[in-house]
Amino acid sequence: MNKKKLFPLALVPLAATSLQAQSNIQTGRTDKRPNIILFMVDDMGWQDTSLPFWTQKTHYNELYETPNMERLARQGMMFTQAYASSISSPTRCSLITGTNAARHRVTNWTLQKNTMTDRKNKQLAVPDWNYNGVSQVPGTNNTFVGTSFVQILKDNGYHTIHCGKAHFGSIDTPGEDPHHWGFEVNIAGHAAGGLASYLGEENYGPVSYTHLR
């Protein structure tokens, strides 16, 4: 395996720890709280790493080398019976609000405000679901209102950063903007699912969202 590919991942916890330490020195604090780095990965199966999310390794686990995930599991806690929804928005809405899809009722991916994204079916009626996503404030129809764990962390002194895909709420709703959820810095997160580029510093999507800059 190309060791160069592992190097940036290995640096992530180190960089975060260093930034926190520098901040503590500048402010004179002796903060013992841990840094929290949370990765949300789309379309990743439970056998897609060298770390088995089961009682034993499978053949597919042997196809990968993910030593940093193995190290995280040894040093932390691993859940072997924690399940995500089968599509992006429902999983992300569950993560940010701490509720499952049966409660927040975001059961498909979201994009345009007040627009369902379901395929039309002559035999089946589309159920009424929260196609505008989730929010921390009321006032938008077909939206689940919940408290963000990020907001709780921010209110308790954490510096919060979002980087990458967001997909919490439809366009022109409060929930589309990661800042709404308590993130002080947002890099590329917005209402659409994918990013146009991971290389630029602004204009990460086909639409010019002011909160991406």
Language model: regions and residue ranges:
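Loop/turn elements at helix/coil->beta-strand transitions in domains of secreted/extracellular proteins
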Residues: 33-36, 75-80, 156-160, 184
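Conserved small/polar residues in nucleotide/adenosyl-binding loops
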Residues: 210-211
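Active-site glycine-centered loops adjacent to acidic/histidine catalytic or metal-binding residues
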Residues: 165
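Bacterial Sec-dependent N-terminal signal peptides
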Residues: 1-31
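Short aromatic-enriched loop/helix-cap "lid" or pocket-rim segments at secondary-structure transitions
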Residues: 51, 94, 173-176, 198-201
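Active-site segment of extracytoplasmic enzymes that catalyze sulfate/phosphate-ester chemistry
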Residues: 38-39, 46-148, 152, 195
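Short active-site segment of divalent metal-dependent hydrolases/proteases
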Residues: 45, 168
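Acidic, His- and aromatic-enriched active-site or binding-groove loops in soluble protein domains
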Residues: 102, 106-108, 178-195
